[in-house]
């Protein structure tokens, strides 16, 4: 029941620096609203960064200062199970590598520049894409993640 869940989301957003959702999640939770509109509302409620996975259309993220979209990574899809979790793990990994996580870095996350935001989002999308190349929720290996990091420009 989406109307019953919305207040819980509002409470979570108000206390979260980072919020990730899929476009499917948002279509269910806020029917008839664009993901961009919902994300900007979440920023107003307190989130520093909102990331939205767009399925086969890539991913999008925004802060109050900017927004960026990354194209999907071209892979042969075996299974999409675990892709969202892998995206979130990749996003957190890349943000940690950029020293943008934690209460002490909240202002830095809010001020993330466009090149960094794009690199972080591209890395998360690549990790999700790697997960889709094999059946089951089978995230990439450490070696594959390092290769993805190099390919997406995250150091």
Where are these regions (language model features)?
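Conserved beta-alpha-beta core of the PfkB/ribokinase-like small-molecule kinase fold
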Residues: 1-40, 47, 57-58
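Conserved phosphate-binding/catalytic region of the ribokinase-like
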Residues: 31-155
């Amino acid at each position: 029941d989406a109307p019953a869940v919305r207040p819980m989301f509002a409470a979570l957003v108000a206390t979260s620096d980072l919020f990730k959702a899929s476009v499917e999640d948002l279509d269910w939770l806020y029917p008839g609203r664009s993901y961009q509109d919902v994300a900007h509302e979440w920023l107003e409620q307190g989130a520093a960064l909102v990331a939205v996975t767009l399925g086969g259309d890539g991913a999008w993220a925004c802060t109050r200062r900017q927004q960026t979209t990354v194209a999907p990574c071209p892979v042969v899809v075996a299974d999409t199970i675990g892709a969202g979790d892998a995206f979130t793990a990749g996003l957190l990994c890349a943000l940690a590598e950029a020293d943008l996580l934690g209460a002490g870095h909240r202002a830095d996350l809010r001020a993330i520049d466009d090149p960094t935001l794009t690199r972080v989002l591209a890395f998360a999308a690549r990790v999700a894409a790697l997960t889709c190349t094999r059946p089951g929720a089978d995230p990439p290996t450490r070696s594959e993640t390092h290769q993805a990091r190099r390919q997406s420009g995250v150091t």
